[in-house]
């Protein structure tokens, strides 16, 4: 089980992680919300690290990605969809991992969906850093063109990516 690293996942106050761990939590996360204040985030990660726990991060720049439906592309523009560049994922990953590395917490990047993020994680792992990653089945099976006809059930966070990102993840998932 996972538990919220900050109270009400608001990113303002650190949860009582040791009590949550005693209650059965094996990992901590802030869900789909990033912790914007780096001082609070680092303190929370230090606390999780002191418990030899895992932090699961949702990699995206929250403000860049808030309320969007698609990845920035010609397709999204043609459809008139609000969008975010796929680099928002890499921005979130790099920021979060920098703080995770400072705290020496075990870090899991949830739902990696782009080639650039995958390559960054591969680089960090080659340096012996404490990082793992995952993706979602949606991002392995579908791409941004699947939202045609405004299929709202494909409104995901992170949004569906290009076919080339999807194929890259499929070809390299074993890494």
Protein language model annotation of sequence segments:
Residues 1-12:
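Metal-cofactor-binding active-site regions of metalloenzymes
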């Amino acid at each position: 089980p996972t538990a919220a690293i900050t109270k009400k996942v608001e990113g303002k106050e650190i949860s009582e992680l040791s009590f949550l761990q005693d209650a059965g939590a094996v990992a901590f996360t802030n869900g789909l919300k990033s912790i914007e204040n780096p001082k609070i985030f680092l303190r929370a990660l230090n606390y999780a690290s002191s418990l030899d726990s895992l932090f699961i991060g949702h990699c995206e720049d929250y403000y860049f990605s808030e309320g969007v439906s698609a990845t920035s592309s010609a397709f999204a523009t043609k459809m008139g969809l609000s969008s975010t560049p796929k680099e928002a994922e890499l921005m979130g990953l790099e920021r979060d991992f920098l703080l995770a590395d400072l705290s020496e917490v075990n870090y899991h990047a949830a739902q990696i969906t782009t080639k650039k993020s995958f390559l960054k994680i591969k680089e960090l792992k080659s340096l012996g850093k404490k990082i793992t990653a995952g993706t979602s089945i949606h991002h392995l099976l579908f791409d941004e063109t699947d939202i045609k006809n405004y299929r709202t059930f494909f409104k995901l966070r992170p949004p569906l990516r290009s076919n080339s990102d999807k194929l890259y993840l499929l070809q390299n998932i074993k890494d």
